[in-house]
Protein backbone atom coordinates (compact mmCIF):
# COMPACT_ATOMS: atom_id res chain seq x y z
CA UNK A 1 0.00 0.00 0.00
CA UNK A 2 1.28 3.47 -0.87
CA UNK A 3 2.32 5.60 2.09
CA UNK A 4 1.08 9.19 1.97
CA UNK A 5 2.50 12.32 3.59
CA UNK A 6 0.05 15.22 3.70
CA UNK A 7 1.55 18.71 3.74
CA UNK A 8 -0.91 21.50 4.59
CA UNK A 9 0.55 24.89 3.78
CA UNK A 10 2.87 25.01 0.78
CA UNK A 11 5.41 27.36 2.35
CA UNK A 12 9.09 26.97 3.09
CA UNK A 13 8.77 25.17 6.42
CA UNK A 14 6.27 22.58 5.22
CA UNK A 15 8.44 21.86 2.19
CA UNK A 16 11.59 21.57 4.31
CA UNK A 17 10.04 18.92 6.54
CA UNK A 18 8.48 17.11 3.58
CA UNK A 19 11.83 16.79 1.81
CA UNK A 20 13.26 15.00 4.82
CA UNK A 21 10.44 12.53 5.51
CA UNK A 22 8.83 11.80 2.13
CA UNK A 23 11.38 9.82 0.12
CA UNK A 24 9.60 6.80 -1.36
CA UNK A 25 6.22 8.13 -0.26
CA UNK A 26 3.44 10.00 -2.05
CA UNK A 27 3.18 13.68 -1.09
CA UNK A 28 -0.21 15.38 -1.05
CA UNK A 29 0.50 19.10 -0.98
CA UNK A 30 -2.47 21.29 -0.02
CA UNK A 31 -2.81 25.06 0.19
CA UNK A 32 -5.54 27.67 0.16
CA UNK A 33 -4.22 28.89 -3.19
CA UNK A 34 -3.74 26.49 -6.07
CA UNK A 35 -0.86 28.54 -7.47
CA UNK A 36 1.07 28.16 -4.20
CA UNK A 37 0.52 24.41 -4.17
CA UNK A 38 1.53 24.12 -7.82
CA UNK A 39 4.73 26.11 -7.31
CA UNK A 40 5.78 24.01 -4.33
CA UNK A 41 4.81 20.80 -6.12
CA UNK A 42 7.05 21.72 -9.04
CA UNK A 43 10.01 22.17 -6.70
CA UNK A 44 9.41 18.82 -4.99
CA UNK A 45 8.69 17.01 -8.26
CA UNK A 46 11.94 18.30 -9.73
CA UNK A 47 13.70 16.89 -6.66
CA UNK A 48 12.30 13.43 -7.35
CA UNK A 49 9.21 13.32 -5.16
CA UNK A 50 5.82 12.04 -6.31
CA UNK A 51 3.38 14.88 -5.63
CA UNK A 52 -0.32 15.60 -5.95
CA UNK A 53 -1.88 18.95 -5.06
CA UNK A 54 -5.18 20.02 -3.54
CA UNK A 55 -6.90 23.17 -2.37
CA UNK A 56 -7.89 23.36 1.29
CA UNK A 57 -9.41 25.98 3.55
CA UNK A 58 -8.44 24.78 7.01
CA UNK A 59 -11.09 26.98 8.63
CA UNK A 60 -13.89 24.97 6.92
CA UNK A 61 -14.66 21.45 8.11
CA UNK A 62 -16.01 20.29 4.76
CA UNK A 63 -12.80 21.40 3.06
CA UNK A 64 -10.55 19.61 5.55
CA UNK A 65 -12.71 16.49 5.36
CA UNK A 66 -12.50 16.56 1.55
CA UNK A 67 -8.70 16.68 1.84
CA UNK A 68 -8.79 13.63 4.11
CA UNK A 69 -10.83 11.78 1.49
CA UNK A 70 -8.30 12.64 -1.20
CA UNK A 71 -5.45 11.50 1.03
CA UNK A 72 -6.92 8.12 1.93
CA UNK A 73 -7.75 7.60 -1.73
CA UNK A 74 -4.01 7.76 -2.45
CA UNK A 75 -2.97 5.29 0.26
CA UNK A 76 -2.19 5.01 3.97
CA UNK A 77 -1.73 8.40 5.62
CA UNK A 78 1.59 7.94 7.41
CA UNK A 79 2.48 11.60 7.93
CA UNK A 80 0.74 14.95 8.43
CA UNK A 81 2.64 18.23 8.33
CA UNK A 82 0.40 21.14 9.27
CA UNK A 83 2.17 24.39 8.42
CA UNK A 84 -0.72 26.59 7.28
CA UNK A 85 -1.56 29.77 9.13
CA UNK A 86 -1.79 33.54 9.17
CA UNK A 87 0.28 36.02 11.17
CA UNK A 88 -0.63 39.11 13.22
CA UNK A 89 0.33 41.43 10.36
CA UNK A 90 -1.79 39.53 7.86
CA UNK A 91 -5.21 39.15 9.44
CA UNK A 92 -7.78 40.27 12.01
CA UNK A 93 -8.12 38.59 15.41
CA UNK A 94 -11.22 36.74 14.21
CA UNK A 95 -9.44 35.35 11.14
CA UNK A 96 -6.37 34.36 13.15
CA UNK A 97 -8.49 32.42 15.64
CA UNK A 98 -10.47 30.79 12.84
CA UNK A 99 -7.42 29.69 10.83
CA UNK A 100 -4.67 29.17 13.39
CA UNK A 101 -6.69 27.80 16.31
CA UNK A 102 -9.89 26.28 14.93
CA UNK A 103 -8.23 25.20 11.69
CA UNK A 104 -5.52 23.33 13.54
CA UNK A 105 -8.10 21.61 15.74
CA UNK A 106 -9.96 20.52 12.60
CA UNK A 107 -6.82 19.11 11.00
CA UNK A 108 -5.90 17.20 14.16
CA UNK A 109 -9.40 15.78 14.53
CA UNK A 110 -9.99 14.84 10.90
CA UNK A 111 -6.57 13.33 10.24
CA UNK A 112 -6.53 11.74 13.69
CA UNK A 113 -9.45 9.65 12.47
CA UNK A 114 -7.42 8.12 9.63
CA UNK A 115 -3.73 8.30 10.56
CA UNK A 116 -2.05 4.94 10.01
CA UNK A 117 -0.32 2.91 12.70
CA UNK A 118 3.28 4.05 12.91
CA UNK A 119 2.32 7.45 11.53
CA UNK A 120 3.28 10.85 12.89
CA UNK A 121 2.16 14.44 12.66
CA UNK A 122 3.81 17.79 13.21
CA UNK A 123 2.00 21.08 13.77
CA UNK A 124 3.91 24.33 13.32
CA UNK A 125 3.05 26.54 16.28
CA UNK A 126 5.20 29.53 17.33
CA UNK A 127 7.40 31.00 20.01
CA UNK A 128 4.52 33.46 20.48
CA UNK A 129 2.62 30.79 22.36
CA UNK A 130 5.40 30.87 24.95
CA UNK A 131 5.18 34.66 25.25
CA UNK A 132 1.58 34.56 26.43
CA UNK A 133 1.12 34.81 30.18
CA UNK A 134 -0.10 31.84 32.16
CA UNK A 135 -3.69 30.80 31.59
CA UNK A 136 -5.88 29.28 34.27
CA UNK A 137 -6.07 25.50 34.50
CA UNK A 138 -9.66 25.73 33.29
CA UNK A 139 -8.63 27.76 30.23
CA UNK A 140 -5.87 25.26 29.40
CA UNK A 141 -8.36 22.41 29.51
CA UNK A 142 -10.87 24.37 27.44
CA UNK A 143 -8.37 25.05 24.66
CA UNK A 144 -7.20 21.43 24.72
CA UNK A 145 -10.48 19.55 25.07
CA UNK A 146 -13.45 21.63 23.90
CA UNK A 147 -15.16 19.89 20.95
CA UNK A 148 -13.78 21.41 17.78
CA UNK A 149 -17.00 22.95 16.53
CA UNK A 150 -17.57 24.61 19.92
CA UNK A 151 -14.05 25.97 20.25
CA UNK A 152 -14.61 29.47 18.87
CA UNK A 153 -17.62 29.92 21.16
CA UNK A 154 -15.42 29.87 24.29
CA UNK A 155 -15.94 33.06 26.34
CA UNK A 156 -12.18 33.71 26.41
CA UNK A 157 -12.12 33.92 22.60
CA UNK A 158 -14.93 36.41 22.08
CA UNK A 159 -14.25 39.75 20.31
CA UNK A 160 -14.52 41.75 23.52
CA UNK A 161 -11.81 39.54 25.06
CA UNK A 162 -9.44 39.30 22.08
CA UNK A 163 -9.10 42.68 20.42
CA UNK A 164 -5.49 42.58 19.21
CA UNK A 165 -4.11 40.37 16.40
CA UNK A 166 -0.98 39.54 18.39
CA UNK A 167 -3.06 38.39 21.37
CA UNK A 168 -5.16 36.24 19.02
CA UNK A 169 -1.99 34.75 17.55
CA UNK A 170 -0.47 34.01 20.95
CA UNK A 171 -3.68 32.37 22.15
CA UNK A 172 -3.91 30.33 18.96
CA UNK A 173 -0.34 29.07 19.19
CA UNK A 174 -0.66 28.26 22.89
CA UNK A 175 -3.87 26.47 21.96
CA UNK A 176 -2.06 24.51 19.24
CA UNK A 177 0.39 23.06 21.75
CA UNK A 178 -2.36 22.22 24.24
CA UNK A 179 -4.55 20.71 21.55
CA UNK A 180 -1.72 18.53 20.29
CA UNK A 181 -1.03 17.33 23.82
CA UNK A 182 -4.65 16.21 24.14
CA UNK A 183 -4.81 14.76 20.62
CA UNK A 184 -1.65 12.73 21.27
CA UNK A 185 -3.74 10.53 23.56
CA UNK A 186 -6.25 9.85 20.78
CA UNK A 187 -3.61 9.44 18.07
CA UNK A 188 -1.74 7.04 20.34
CA UNK A 189 -4.70 4.67 20.32
CA UNK A 190 -4.11 4.33 16.57
CA UNK A 191 -0.39 3.74 17.10
CA UNK A 192 0.54 7.23 15.89
CA UNK A 193 2.31 10.25 17.35
CA UNK A 194 1.83 14.02 17.05
CA UNK A 195 3.89 16.99 18.26
CA UNK A 196 4.27 20.72 17.79
CA UNK A 197 7.29 22.76 16.80
CA UNK A 198 7.33 26.36 18.05
CA UNK A 199 9.81 28.22 15.84
CA UNK A 200 11.08 31.69 16.51
CA UNK A 201 11.84 34.09 13.70
CA UNK A 202 12.51 31.88 10.70
CA UNK A 203 13.11 33.65 7.41
CA UNK A 204 10.07 32.88 5.28
CA UNK A 205 7.70 35.13 3.31
CA UNK A 206 5.44 35.27 6.38
CA UNK A 207 8.37 36.36 8.57
CA UNK A 208 9.33 39.03 6.07
CA UNK A 209 5.79 40.41 6.35
CA UNK A 210 6.28 40.65 10.09
CA UNK A 211 9.75 42.19 9.85
CA UNK A 212 8.41 44.95 7.59
CA UNK A 213 5.13 45.33 9.48
CA UNK A 214 4.16 47.47 12.46
CA UNK A 215 6.02 45.19 14.90
CA UNK A 216 9.12 44.90 12.71
CA UNK A 217 11.41 46.85 15.01
CA UNK A 218 10.59 44.53 17.90
CA UNK A 219 11.28 41.45 15.79
CA UNK A 220 14.61 42.84 14.62
CA UNK A 221 15.52 43.49 18.25
CA UNK A 222 14.69 39.86 19.07
CA UNK A 223 17.13 38.70 16.39
CA UNK A 224 19.86 41.04 17.60
CA UNK A 225 19.57 40.23 21.31
CA UNK A 226 18.75 36.52 21.31
CA UNK A 227 21.59 34.13 22.26
CA UNK A 228 21.87 32.79 18.71
CA UNK A 229 22.17 36.32 17.35
CA UNK A 230 20.37 35.49 14.13
CA UNK A 231 17.13 34.32 12.59
CA UNK A 232 16.49 30.68 11.79
CA UNK A 233 16.05 28.91 8.47
CA UNK A 234 13.31 26.59 7.23
CA UNK A 235 15.88 23.80 6.85
CA UNK A 236 16.66 23.96 10.56
CA UNK A 237 12.97 23.50 11.34
CA UNK A 238 12.94 20.70 8.79
CA UNK A 239 15.66 18.87 10.70
CA UNK A 240 13.63 18.95 13.91
CA UNK A 241 10.51 17.92 12.00
CA UNK A 242 12.37 14.92 10.62
CA UNK A 243 13.40 13.89 14.13
CA UNK A 244 9.85 14.16 15.46
CA UNK A 245 8.32 12.26 12.53
CA UNK A 246 11.03 9.63 12.18
CA UNK A 247 12.16 6.54 14.10
CA UNK A 248 14.53 8.47 16.37
CA UNK A 249 11.54 10.40 17.68
CA UNK A 250 9.54 7.29 18.48
CA UNK A 251 9.24 8.10 22.20
CA UNK A 252 8.20 11.73 21.59
CA UNK A 253 4.50 12.56 21.40
CA UNK A 254 2.25 15.25 22.82
CA UNK A 255 5.28 17.51 23.12
CA UNK A 256 6.15 21.03 22.02
CA UNK A 257 9.64 21.71 20.69
CA UNK A 258 10.62 25.38 21.16
CA UNK A 259 13.35 26.42 18.71
CA UNK A 260 13.69 30.18 18.75
CA UNK A 261 17.41 30.89 18.97
CA UNK A 262 16.97 31.56 22.66
CA UNK A 263 14.52 34.46 22.27
CA UNK A 264 12.26 33.10 25.01
CA UNK A 265 15.28 32.59 27.27
CA UNK A 266 16.33 36.20 26.65
CA UNK A 267 12.81 37.40 27.47
CA UNK A 268 12.90 35.60 30.78
CA UNK A 269 16.51 35.97 31.86
CA UNK A 270 18.36 38.17 29.38
CA UNK A 271 18.42 41.48 27.59
CA UNK A 272 14.90 41.14 26.22
CA UNK A 273 13.39 40.87 29.72
CA UNK A 274 10.92 43.69 30.47
CA UNK A 275 12.58 46.38 32.56
CA UNK A 276 10.93 47.78 35.73
CA UNK A 277 9.67 51.29 35.10
CA UNK A 278 9.69 52.63 38.67
CA UNK A 279 11.81 52.27 41.78
CA UNK A 280 8.91 50.55 43.51
CA UNK A 281 8.71 47.95 40.75
CA UNK A 282 12.47 47.42 40.87
CA UNK A 283 12.32 46.48 44.55
CA UNK A 284 9.01 44.59 44.45
Where is each model-derived feature located?
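Canonical Rossmann dinucleotide-binding motif of NAD(H)/NADP(H)-dependent dehydrogenases/reductases
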Residues: 1-28
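Conserved glycine-rich Rossmann-like NAD(P)H-binding loop of the short-chain dehydrogenase/reductase
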Residues: 24-39
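Rossmann-fold cofactor-recognition segment
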Residues: 44-62
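Conserved Rossmann-fold cofactor-binding substructure of NAD(P)-dependent oxidoreductases
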Residues: 59-75
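Catalytic loop of short-chain dehydrogenase/reductase
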Residues: 87-90, 117-190, 201-204
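C-terminal helical subdomain
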Residues: 106, 161, 168-169, 174-177, ...
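A glycine/serine/threonine-rich, flexible loop-to-helix segment
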Residues: 135-146, 202-225, 266-284
Amino acid sequence: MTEVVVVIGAGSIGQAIARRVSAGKHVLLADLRQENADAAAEVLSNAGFEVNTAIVDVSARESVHALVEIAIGLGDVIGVIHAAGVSPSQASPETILSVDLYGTALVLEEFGNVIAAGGAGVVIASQSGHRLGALTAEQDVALAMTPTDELLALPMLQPDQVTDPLHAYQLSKRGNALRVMAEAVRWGKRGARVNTISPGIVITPLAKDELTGPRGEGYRRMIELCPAGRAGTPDEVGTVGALLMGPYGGFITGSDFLMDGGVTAAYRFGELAPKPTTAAQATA
